[in-house]
Structures are given as structure tokens and as C-alpha cells.
Amino acid sequence: MKKTLFLLVLFSFVFAAAGVWAGGQQDAESEDEQSNLIYIITPSHDNPFFKTEAVAAEDEAEKLGYQTRVLSHDDDANLQDQQFGNAIAAGAAAIICDNAGADASIGPIRRAKEAGIPTFLIDREINETGLAVSQIVSNNYQGAVIGGEKFVELMGESGKYVELVGKESDTNAGIRSKGYHEVIDQYPDLEMVARQSANWSQTEAYSKMESIIQANPDIKGVICGNDTMAMGAMAALKTADMGDVIVVGFDGSNDVRDSILAGDIKATVLQTCAYNARLAVQQADKYIKTGSTGAPEKQLTDCVLIDKANADKLDNFVLSE
Amino acid sequence: MVHKALSYIIHTFILMICLLIAGSCTVVRHDQQTESEEDELSIYFDNGEFDAKLYVESVWEEAVLPRIKEEAVEAEVLFESLNSDPSTAIEKYGYRIEVTAPYNFMVKGSAIITQANVKSAAATISIDANGPDGKPVEIQIGPVIKGTAVRDSMDFIHFEDFTNQLEFANISREMNNHIKATILASLKREELVGAKIRYLGAFQWVEGEGVLITPVDLVVEE
């Protein structure tokens, strides 16, 4: 049933694409007009982070006079392959993508390039240069380091703690974990008693945290690879009457902002995802019009620490001055 | 008109055949993850091909130190300038690697150590200098050294020259390790307060915050 539905969806996409393609062909015959369609492909919009970057990219593209097609690959590299295929078939002007894997995404980006369609990556980078026109990379490592430093400070440099890691297939899960440990492991009195993946999920973080608490009732802190897991962990801790345990997240969502303001979660790390998405669209526009973005392919944007001091200035992943 | 309709039908027909072929193939997922044991999450992104330590050793004497020696501004001049006219100071002395990052400054000076903050593993010494906005000025003495001020002051180290952000991050880590091993290892940590020092280093400046210098040279004068 699922497969049938999937095929139906696929069919409809391809036909839609075919329509645009055929239309494009006819236009090309008549007046050699350029494509005006930008594909925006990101992970699932269930996570407000990805929704924000998709909406920002869409808004910026429409402001610049483009039509958009917004898709989610749900961190499935095969689905991403098909979506790139659609964009190629549709003769898109550009693809804006938060990719589904540092290695798995190399193939489709190369095919798009060969078909003359430039790709602009946001948030996550790929392990190859010379394929995408821009890689506007959120410096997750730097973000994890400042989050880790805040966590160490809140812990008073000692005590037992737990780490909740994100989805393993996601590059940033590894990068953030490595950044945290780069800092925390330099402090001999901080002891990690459990380290588990909760796959970026709030419910999974809740249930994993519940069982971790059973075995380790004396934990002092929990450091999480993203905000949804931090929310899950905080909820489990509060249920167990352990609301004073230090929880630190990553992303800068409004949920965690509110939790920080309420005194529950202590800190998170903001990625400037809306800024990055708009920058990518602006560079795509410039590239389409002039053949160059004027910027290097790989561009790094820093993350910002959010705690009680600045949480009230945060809204939808944008920190007001 | 007839020609266009015909072309449309032919395109659709070709696509349908393609789909039939595609439909008969088995789609194999290539992003499958093997379940790993607790505490053994693999970080495949870091393939270990790049030796950051070797890289830092190769540029330290030839490029890092010469640049900081050349570009460093006398502390009193720099702090006064940041205090009175930050935008001019930034334009004149600041360097940053990208638009969302804070500016880095290279600095040198002589000072008296007023306090040794050695309770934390990220230990620092406070010096008798007036930071911008009257904020304190500290120098990191480790063992934990925070930040990436030294790497980010280098105009010859560009993110795009490295495979990914981990390699880029490892450069900063190895620079800080190099500083610990060469400059800070011989520091007599019990006899710091009251001592006169000469220092050379870099810091990342955020307006309204104190100055935290990562030293690349630190000499206690007899």
C-alpha cells in the first residue's frame, strides 16, 4: 500500500516535472528563455529548524522573482536522488539543498552539475569540492565547542553526565559530539556515565532518559546533540523530580528558548539557518545572472550561544540585535 | 499546434517507458546504518587522513609567529582604540574569517600579573591593563585553552582549503596544544602574581566583553 502510494506520488512528480520540462523545451524553441524555477530540498519540516531554513529560502527566492518547489528528503538519500532527478528533468535554474549525507549526496549533485544545474548547499557540507557552487556551512564544530564550554562551566567542571547523540547517518551528529568531547574530555572530573543516540527525536530522548535515570540517579548534567532531544530529556528529568539537572541543547528553537526563560534547560547553540538560507538564494541569483557568486565555494558561518542572558531576543532562529 | 501536441505525447511516452524500466528494478538503500553498541558511536566524517599536528608544526615558525610579530599592536594603543572608536579600530587592526564571526586582534605588551585564576582547568592570569570599556584583560595559561583566536588571525588559513570543518577545527586544537607544549609548559605557576611579563598573542573580541588573550609568546622577566 505504501509502495503504491509512493509510486503515485512519484508519478505525479514526474508528470509535473515533465510538464515543466516540455514547457521549458517549447519556451526554449520560441525565445530561448531561462528557467525561473528554484528547487529547495531539506530534511523533514517536522523539525522547526529545517522548516525555518526552507521557508527563508522560499521567501528570498520569491522576493527575487523565482518560482519555487519545496521538498523534503527526510534524510533518505534515495529520496534525495529522486528529487534531484526531478529538478534535472524540470530544468531547474538552481537547487538549494540541506543534504542527506556528506558522501551519499555527491552523486546527485554531480549529476545536476553535469546537467547544467548549479547546487547551493546550506547547513551541512559534503566531502567533495568543485561540485556545488556554494557550501554555506554552519560551523557545528565551533557551536559544539561553545556549547560544551558553557556546559562545563554550568557543571562547575565536575560531576556525572549523560550525552544524547543525534542520528548517526547525519554528519552533524558526529561533528557536534566530537566538538562536545573536544572540550569536556579535557576536564578529568567530568565523568560520562551514558552515551546514547536518540535519533534527534523528542519521544526517543524521553524514553532513553527515563531508563538512564533508573541506572544513574546521581547525574548532574545532560548534553544533547539538538534541541528536540533536550526537550525530551528535560521532560523525563522533571517527571523524575530531577528538574535541577543541567540540560544543554543545540539549534536555538523557540521551544528551548521558552524552556531557558522558564529556568529549565540552561543553554543552547543557535545556528543562523535563516541567514544561511537567504544567503544561498542570493548567491544562486547572482550566479544565474552573472555566472559567479563572487564568494568562495566553502563558506563557514559561526553559531551563537543562547542562555538566559539573550534568550528573550531569539525568535524563529533569528537573534535580534 | 499539432506539432507541439505530438511532441508532448512523445515525451510522455518516453517517460512512461523509463518509469516502467525503473519500476522493475529493486531499489537498494545505500544509507543503511549498522547499529553500534552504546558508547561506540562512530564518526565516519573524520577519516584521519589530514594530520593537523604536522600542518601546525610546518607553519608555526615560518608563518604563524612572523605574522603575529608583524601585525601585533601595542596593548595600550589597541585597547584605547577599541574603547574610543570600535569601528575604526576594527577596520584598522581587526581580522575575521567570515561575516558572522567576531573580529580577531593581534596584540603585544608588558604587564604585571595581578591575579592567577588557576581553580579552573581553563586557567588564566589577569594583568594590569585597561581593556575596552574598563573590562578586565586575561591571558590563557591552560591546561585548557579556549577559542580559535590564533587560527582565525591567520590570513593564509582558509576554510575552503580543507576537506571539512573537522579538519579546520583540528588546526586550532593543534595550535593550542603547540602553545601548551612550548610556551606554557615551563611557566612556574606558583610564582605568577606580581611578576612582570612580556606577551604576544591574539584574541577574539566581542564588544562589551572582557579580553581573553591566547599567547604565542609569554616571558616572565627576572
State each model region's role:
Chain B
Residues 25-222:
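OB-fold and OB-like single-stranded nucleic-acid-recognition modules
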